Amino acid sequence: AAVVALWGKIGKSADVIGNDALSRMIVVYPETKTYFSHWPDLAPGSPHIKAHGKKVMGGIALAVTKIDDLKAGLFDLSEQHAYKLRVDPSNFKILNHCILVVISIMFPKEFTPEAHVSLDKFLSGVALALAERYK
């Protein structure tokens, strides 16, 4: 309930959150650039970063609607990341951390300790669900 309530407050800013989180991940964790080497511009806020950040947050929005069964709800995304994109699942945790940082900066009033723990637990569940097809 806490995640759904928080998402209701921050969801309209999902595109900005996604752009900022992905930009932050690529700068702070440069080893993650390898997955985006086919993009001509990896600068923070570049068109590809913005578009993929929007896509990532679309996946998070989907996960919010599937919160009661993340494994089933994110099955297709797990398949895509495991078999097509071949993303190392440890990167999900890195991006989750960047998402938390951005939300804490953008929404300090809403990002209470209780919201923090709820969102962290939810994003960890999303990461586990996305890693499901790697087994």
From Swiss-Prot:
<dbReference type="InterPro" id="IPR009050">
    <property type="entry name" value="Globin-like_sf"/>
</dbReference>
<dbReference type="GO" id="GO:0004601">
    <property type="term" value="F:peroxidase activity"/>
</dbReference>
<dbReference type="GO" id="GO:0043177">
    <property type="term" value="F:organic acid binding"/>
</dbReference>
<dbReference type="InterPro" id="IPR012292">
    <property type="entry name" value="Globin/Proto"/>
</dbReference>
<comment type="similarity">
    <text>Belongs to the globin family.</text>
</comment>
<dbReference type="InterPro" id="IPR000971">
    <property type="entry name" value="Globin"/>
</dbReference>
<keyword id="KW-0561">Oxygen transport</keyword>
<dbReference type="GO" id="GO:0019825">
    <property type="term" value="F:oxygen binding"/>
</dbReference>
<feature type="binding site" description="proximal binding residue">
    <location>
        <position position="81"/>
    </location>
    <ligand>
        <name>heme b</name>
    </ligand>
</feature>
<dbReference type="GO" id="GO:0005833">
    <property type="term" value="C:hemoglobin complex"/>
</dbReference>
<dbReference type="InterPro" id="IPR002338">
    <property type="entry name" value="Hemoglobin_a-typ"/>
</dbReference>
<keyword id="KW-0813">Transport</keyword>
<feature type="binding site">
    <location>
        <position position="52"/>
    </location>
    <ligand>
        <name>O2</name>
    </ligand>
</feature>
<feature type="domain" description="Globin">
    <location>
        <begin position="1"/>
        <end position="135"/>
    </location>
</feature>
<dbReference type="GO" id="GO:0031720">
    <property type="term" value="F:haptoglobin binding"/>
</dbReference>
<dbReference type="Pfam" id="PF00042">
    <property type="entry name" value="Globin"/>
</dbReference>
<protein>
    <recommendedName>
        <fullName>Hemoglobin subunit alpha</fullName>
    </recommendedName>
</protein>
<keyword id="KW-0408">Iron</keyword>
<comment type="function">
    <text>Involved in oxygen transport from gills to the various peripheral tissues.</text>
</comment>
<dbReference type="GO" id="GO:0005344">
    <property type="term" value="F:oxygen carrier activity"/>
</dbReference>
<dbReference type="InterPro" id="IPR050056">
    <property type="entry name" value="Hemoglobin_oxygen_transport"/>
</dbReference>
<comment type="subunit">
    <text>Hb1 is a heterotetramer of two alpha chains and two beta-1 chains. Hb2 is a heterotetramer of two alpha chains and two beta-2 chains.</text>
</comment>
<dbReference type="GO" id="GO:0031838">
    <property type="term" value="C:haptoglobin-hemoglobin complex"/>
</dbReference>
<dbReference type="GO" id="GO:0042744">
    <property type="term" value="P:hydrogen peroxide catabolic process"/>
</dbReference>
<keyword id="KW-0479">Metal-binding</keyword>
<dbReference type="GO" id="GO:0046872">
    <property type="term" value="F:metal ion binding"/>
</dbReference>
<dbReference type="GO" id="GO:0072562">
    <property type="term" value="C:blood microparticle"/>
</dbReference>
<keyword id="KW-0349">Heme</keyword>
<dbReference type="GO" id="GO:0020037">
    <property type="term" value="F:heme binding"/>
</dbReference>
